[in-house]
């Protein structure tokens, strides 16, 4: 939000995103649109869920008429676990783009070397790294781009001087101008404890553990077949599983090849005390791609509704939406995966 409201969008701006961005990043587009700027999404490939790099390259190169150009780039998909090529950051910057790197899904299990990769802005969520506290994030800003962010309002703790009679104010000339109100000083000390905990384990060890568990999950899932040969599980994402994080997106099918609704899988998993995430995971781009929702279908729905929700759209379109996501991370062990497989085996031959 800080980048969105403070970036100098205008009618000659271009905001470029991937269709694999989280809604926390997608929302920035409203700031650009409100100033008359252009918003473009680089698509991802169906089922493979990797970037259409030719499209992205064309958009980056064909932008000479724009003044302020911002690329929002996810280091890793929060849904599929796909790690996008970070070389695009420098490629974009060399063409005059500023780059906002969403590293929230990446840094819990990967090292982000900011001496090598130099985005202009980086967003991080601490609770996704070590589970606590929620509600405290981090925005890293390249010092050279700090003054480019023009905060449009102020609140307590962000100003050095305010006048009521002349309606003038001066913002604090450092990062405090973006820290509205009283900081959450009761929870902030937990961040140091969490970071020390991760450092003691070692991010390299965490990365290797997640890779090992991910490989084991894939092997077990791919062997789940009904007696007639129909696969129980469809795994979305690239065939090469090497460059993936710890999240895996799935769909499930009965013996006749009919897809289960994701709510049904989640409800049955709950009976086994297994917590699964289902829905669109705050990432509508992957959901729309995987479920083959066309631009015309989506435009028709939104133009005929003043409000709506997930279930209403499913009913209107007559198409399946959503999927199921499983995650492996620092707290996961092989027994957790075995319990998941034991549950899924109860769905076989049904």
Where on the chain are the PLM-derived regions?
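Pyridoxal 5′-phosphate
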Residues: 1-350
